[in-house]
Amino acid sequence: MGHGADAENTTAATVRERLETVGATDVATTLQALATPSRLRILARLQEGPCAATELADAVGMEQSACSHQLRLLRNLGLVTGERRGRSVIYALYDNHVAELLEQALHHVEHLRLGLRDAPVTAEAAGAR
């Protein structure tokens, strides 16, 4: 996961503690940013690599103004970056965490559709980590 966070050693208690430290509202705001199909399409395209705003709008089938509005929101939330190059702004995912969020959401929905379920983590197993 990066930044010293080891998913294998994270217990439910530490996730709760971290949520209180970071702020549940900030985490909810980040997740809400993923709550529209247009933003998900933008992030999915940017997962393939950086892209100019005009090309991005075409790639995701949006009007330029609507795409720019969504990009501004995603940028303000720290999910994408924008770098001016001449007359264009090149957008990219902020970091690999954004790609991981998208990948995990897709993986979860695919599991739901297939009726699959990961083995639940028991309190005993979590303590043994």
Where are these regions (language model features)?
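Residue-level detector of secondary-structure transition/capping positions
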Residues: P50-C51, R75, L106
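Amphipathic alpha-helical dimerization/coiled-coil segments
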Residues: M1-D26, D95-R129
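Alpha-helical residues within the helix-turn-helix
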Residues: D58, R75-N76
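N-terminal helix-turn-helix DNA-binding core of bacterial DNA-binding proteins
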Residues: R18-S65, R85, V89-H97
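Residues within the DNA-recognition helix of helix-turn-helix
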Residues: Q70
